[in-house]
């Protein structure tokens, strides 16, 4: 926590469930967006964190199918703690329902802001955002961490691991892991996630971000009450220091010649002095 204007603010906090690539603090990260989202960012001075339940991937925040296949084998080591085989069998049968219920609630609580981890621009992501007015913010993991100085939210940052849901096990006792795994089809995203959590009063009182039965893992604490002006049905806005967050602003390689001047005019109105570079990804040198 830091003290700012006589008020305590939360900021980036390490959490063992959310790991970063080794020696990655100075590595570049990118956030691709269209022009309206960029204007929203600089106007609100906030990053938008989306509820996990609102992501288009239906596997977001779920347990891999392979867990069902190997669950009994994995839990055999704790079988002696049960009074009978019947009790153990009952436990195994109950696990999918228990975790299914918890994850359903977590998908509403966990809020995610996605970044691309790469030393270079991504041709795939330029194509995905495709329009001539697409924009990419260049930052670094350290700059992202340092930008969360104007919020009461605690922010965690971690890399996404790409696993085969049909053949790989996820530690289901660490529920948080479900929000940093994706299928290999998304590997091109090379995703880094900033993550925060809604307070308990936005969901079932029996489930909150405090839940974590794996003792050696640090629980996620519930957050402060949310300013209703920051909250939407899809997530919430989190205040950031734009001067710390943004290193450079890149324009789409397909951007028309006048677009750089338009963007310079826009950011000057917000007193944001950042270099604007048109991508030369498709320029023969």
Regions found by a protein language model. Give the residues of each.
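Partner-binding and oligomerization surfaces adjacent to conserved cores of proteins
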Residues: 1-285
